[in-house]
Amino acid sequence: MTRDAFDAVMNAIEYGTKIDRRVADQVAASMRDWAISKGATHYTHWFQPLTGGTAEKHDAFFEPVTRDSAIERFSGNQLVQQESDASSFPNGGIRNTFEARGYTAWDPSSPPFVYGTVLCIPTIFIAYTGEALDNKTPLLKALSAIDQAATEVARYFDKNVSKVTCTLGCEQEYFLIDRTLATTRPDLMITGRTLLGHEAAKGQQLDDHYLGAIPSRVLAYMRDLEQECLLLGIPVKTRHNEVAPNQFELAPIFGEANLAVDQNSLLMDVMRKVAERHDFVVLFHEKPFAGVNGSGKHNNWSLVTDTGVNLFAPSKTP
C-alpha cells in the first residue's frame, strides 16, 4: 500500500480517525495479496459474541466475473463491514429474536492473521440498531474512556503526555487429561469439569508439582503449541507446572489490552487443537476437580503513557 494509506491506518489505530473507502480498498488489496501468499483461500470477520468463544463465517476470495473466468477479489467494503445473522447469538435480553440482522465491523487496532487457509480479520459485532452484541465493543469504549481520563491526570505531571494505553498480560492456566481417560467421563466431555467421582489418590499437599520438572509428554505438547502461537503472532513467554496435579500455565508477554484479549481468545482455540494432536483434552473450567486448585486467568494490567512511563510501577517511596 502507499505511504499515505499506511499513515491513515496508523492514525486510525492511534487516534481513532476515520478511514475512507479509497484507503480501505488499498488495505484490503494488500491483505488479500499477503494472505494468498500464505496459502489462504478464504477470509472471515472474526468476532467474539457473548458465548465465551469466537465466531467466524468463511467467504472465498474466488469471484466469477464472466461465464468462463473468475478472479480473487477482496474489496474495502468487504473488509470494513459484513452482515451476519445475530438472532442465534446471546444478547442479554436487549433485542427480540426476530431482529436477526447484525453487523461486524473491522477493528484496525488488532492485526489480521492467517489461520490455516483463512484470513481472519478481528471485528466488533453490533446490532442493526447499534447495541453491542460482543465483548470487544464495550472493551474498546472502556479503553477510550480510560485513555481520556488518565491522560488528563498524567498531563498535570508531564505536559508531553498525549495518550495513555492500557496494557494486559493474561495468565492462561489449564489442565491436561489423557484423551482415552477423558472420553470415559461424560461429565468431562460435556461440561469440561467433573460432576461426580472420588477424590484423587494424590492431591497437592506436598506442593511437589508446582514449578516442578515438566513431564516429557506435556513438554512436547507445549513446544508444539509455542510453535503454532509464534506463527500466529501470539508472544508466548513462560510455561510451567501449576499447583494442582496435571495443571499447567502458559503466559504471554504483555501488550495492548484489546490485542491481548484477542490473542488469548485465539490461544485457547489453538490449545484445544494442538491437544488433539497429542491425544490430550485441555480443560479451561475454573474448577474442574474438587479438592485441588482451580484454574484462574489472572489479568496483569497497567497503564502506560506514550512517553514510556508505567503508571502502576511502584516508586522508590511507595
Predicted features, each with a name:
Residues 1-76, 80-98:
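Histidine/acidic residue-rich metal-binding segments in metalloenzymes
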Residues 102-318:
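Glycine-rich, acidic/polar active-site loops that bind/position phosphate-bearing ligands
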